[in-house]
């Protein structure tokens, strides 16, 4: 994937949004999601996200996405994010926005919003979209860890590194190699890639 995700640095903002409209009920739901007030165990949360991806494909929702129109695809993406959001104990707002092709999405810790490139909705294959939702949601989770460290099991020294990275964020247009090597980007990339890889592996248990 040659595109990049963007985490906005203060006072910038990550971007993303599509018209907010009521979403219709869909035929699928995500189960066994933890309460947002509970302490989020990082390992168990990841397992829950893997199970969610597995269910998504096992139930053929990827095929529903491919066959659906833009509104249907937006609804499926939003409901997938709703499951991720509950698993992670985050409350970031999700929206789609017109962006250059190379900008996949972004998270803005100031507004607590995740913005995705609306170009995703034009593609019938939703794998990259799900990966980006997981990636940007992980940034929102990192921010949650910084704001409320007692609500997660992530170690304090890791949270300190993330906080420093958020405060001194390097944008991809400044230094792409340095951008990719930032701890919050490496963590979000690894999280999203591993969840998708295991969730789509029929032999993963």
Regions from the language model: what does each represent?
Residues 1-70, 202-205:
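Low-complexity, glycine/serine/proline-rich disordered segments
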Residues 5, 112-114:
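Hydrophobic residues embedded in beta-strands of well-ordered beta-sheets
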Residues 55-110:
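Auxiliary, metal-adjacent structural segments of Zn-dependent hydrolase domains
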Residues 64, 86-90, 147-149, 197-205:
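Surface-exposed helix-capping loop/turn segments at secondary-structure junctions
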Residues 68-77, 126, 130, 180, ...:
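Hydrophobic (often cysteine-bearing) scaffold residues that line and stabilize catalytic clefts
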Residues 115-132:
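Short pre-active-site segment immediately N-terminal to the catalytic Zn-binding motif
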Residues 136-154:
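Catalytic Zn2+-binding segment of zinc metalloproteases
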Residues 151-205:
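Metalloprotease/metallohydrolase-associated module, dominated by Zn2+-dependent proteases
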């Amino acid at each position: 994937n040659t595109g990049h995700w963007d985490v906005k640095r203060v006072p910038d903002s990550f971007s993303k949004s599509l018209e907010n409209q009521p979403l219709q009920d869909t035929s699928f739901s995500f189960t066994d999601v933890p309460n947002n007030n509970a302490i989020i165990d990082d390992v168990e949360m990841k397992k829950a996200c893997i199970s969610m991806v597995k269910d998504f494909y096992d139930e053929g929702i990827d095929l529903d996405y491919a066959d659906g129109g833009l509104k249907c695809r937006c609804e499926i993406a939003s409901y997938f994010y709703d499951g991720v959001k509950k698993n992670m104990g985050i409350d970031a707002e999700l929206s789609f926005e017109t962006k250059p092709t190379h900008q996949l999405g972004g998270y803005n810790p100031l507004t607590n919003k995740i913005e995705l490139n609306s170009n995703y909705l034009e593609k019938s294959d939703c794998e990259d979209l799900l990966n980006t939702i997981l990636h940007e949601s992980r940034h929102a989770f990192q921010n949650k860890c910084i704001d409320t460290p007692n609500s997660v099991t992530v170690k304090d020294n890791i949270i300190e590194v993330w906080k420093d990275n958020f405060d001194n964020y390097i944008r991809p247009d400044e230094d792409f190699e340095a951008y990719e090597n930032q701890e919050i980007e490496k963590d979000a990339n690894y999280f999203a890639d591993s969840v998708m890889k295991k969730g789509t592996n029929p032999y993963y248990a």
